[in-house]
Amino acid sequence: MEENKQRVKSMINILQLVAPGTPLREGIDNVLRAQTGGLIVLGYNEQIKSIVDGGFHINCAFSPASLYELAKMDGALILNETGSKILIANAQLVPDPSIDSIETGMRHRTAERVAKQTASLVVAISQRRNVITLYQGNLRYTLKDIGVILTKANQAIQTLEKYKAVWNDGITNLGILEFEEVVTMSEVVHVLHSVEMVLRIKNEIVSYIHELGTEGRLIRLQLTELLADLEAEAALLIKDYYQEKTQDHHQILKKLQDLANTQLLEDSDLVKLLGYPGQMSLEESVTPRGYRIASKISRVPPLIIENLINRFKTLQGVCRATINELDDVEGIGEVRAKKIREGLKRIQEHLYMSRHN
C-alpha cells in the first residue's frame, strides 16, 4: 500500500508540473502544435551528467517561447528540477542500452531508459502522433486531450452525485435507528460502504483536477460542494462506532481512503476497521456514542459534546438525561441543557420527515 501511495503522490507532483496553465505545459503544447517533436529532461544531477553528450550550456530563464525555439534542434533539452531554467539545449542522451524498454520509436525509447536510469522526469513529445508521454522511474503516463479529461471528470461528478444520494439515504436511516435503539453492525457497514465509494470517486476526480490545471476550477468547485461536511460526518460516524473510544477517527477515515484506493472492501474489512473481529456477525447490535447526532445541535461546541459523552456514554444516555442531569455536566447550564433537549427532538423529527419525503 505504501508503494502505491508513493506512486500516486509522484504522479500528482508530475501532473501539477505539466498541467494546463503552467509555463512548461504552454511550451510543450507549442512544440506539439509545431509537430517538431521534442525530448525534455527535468533535473541535472550526477546521473544525468553521466549520460549527456555535447549540447550547448545556456543556463537561461525558462519561457514557453524559448522552449519552442530550442526544441527545433534535434537534441534534448535539460531543465532544472522545477522547470524554471533551461540548462542545456541540443544535448545527446546516451542511456544504458541494456535497460528494458517497451517503446519502439527512438525518442520514446531514449526517454524511457533515461527515466529508469536516473529517476528524473522525462517528457517525450511525439512528432507525428500528437502525443505527450511522461516518464519517471518505472512510471509511464500519456497525457490525454483536455476535452477527453473534462468529459471523464463530468461523468465522475455525476457518479459521485448518485453515491452521495446513497450516503444521504443511509445516514438518514441510521439516524432513525439510533434514536429507536435498534442499530446493528449491518447498517453501520452499509453506510461505510457508501463512504468508501464516495472516497474512491473523489480520488479519481482529484487526479483529473491535477491534470486539468487551470481548466479544472469548475470541477474542483463541484467536488467541494458535493463533499461539504460529508467527510467530517463520516469521521464522527467512526468515532461513534469504533470499539474503543478514540480520538484518532480522522486517521481511521484516512486509512479507509487509502484502502479504497487499492481494493474493493468486504464487510469484514470495514468491521475490522472499526476495531472489531472480522468474523463478527453483522446482525449484532451496536450502540452509538452520540458524537455525530450531538454535533448537529446548534451552538454546542465540540468540548461540551465531549463532556456530554463522557458523562452519559451513549446517545441513548444523552436522550434520557433530564434537564437537571444535563445541567450538572461541566459547561452546560440550564439554558444550554434545554437547548440540547430541544435540539435532539428537532433532529429526530427532521429524520422522520426526511424518510417520508
From Swiss-Prot:
- Gene3D superfamilies in UniProt: 5' to 3' exonuclease, C-terminal subdomain, DNA integrity scanning linker region, DNA integrity scanning protein, DisA, N-terminal domain
Q: Which GO terms describe its biological process?
A: DNA repair
Give every DAC domain span.
8-146
Which EC main class describes this enzyme?
transferase
Q: Which reaction does it catalyse?
A: 2 ATP = 3',3'-c-di-AMP + 2 diphosphate
Supply the Pfam families for this chain: DAC (PF02457), DisA-linker (PF10635)
Q: Where does ATP bind?
A: G75, L93, M106, R107, H108, R109, T110
Q: Does the keyword Oxidoreductase apply?
A: no
GO MF assignments: adenylate cyclase activity; ATP binding; diadenylate cyclase activity; DNA binding
On the tree of life, the source organism's domain of life is: Bacteria
Give TM segment ranges. Answer: none
What InterPro entries does UniProt report for this protein, alphabetically?
Answer: DisA, DisA_sf, DNA_integrity_DisA_N_sf, DNA_integrity_scan_DisA_link, DNA_integrity_scan_DisA_N, DNA_integrity_scanning_protein, RuvA_2-like
Its required cofactor(s), as named, are: Mg(2+)
Q: Which UniProt keywords apply?
A: ATP-binding, DNA damage, DNA repair, DNA-binding, Magnesium, Nucleotide-binding, Nucleotidyltransferase, Transferase
EC number(s) from the headed UniProt entry: 2.7.7.85
Q: SUPFAM superfamilies of this UniProt entry? A: RuvA domain 2-like, YojJ-like
How does the record describe its quaternary structure?
Answer: Homooctamer.
Protein task: Participates in a DNA-damage check-point that is active prior to asymmetric division when DNA is damaged. DisA forms globular foci that rapidly scan along the chromosomes during sporulation, searching for lesions. When a lesion is present, DisA pauses at the lesion site. This triggers a cellular response that culminates in a temporary block in sporulation initiation.
Hey, which family's this protein in? Belongs to the DisA family.
> What protein name applies here?
DNA integrity scanning protein DisA
Q: Give the organism, scientific name.
A: Bacillus mycoides (strain KBAB4) (Bacillus weihenstephanensis)
What does the record give as the organism's lineage? Answer: Bacteria, Bacillati, Bacillota, Bacilli, Bacillales
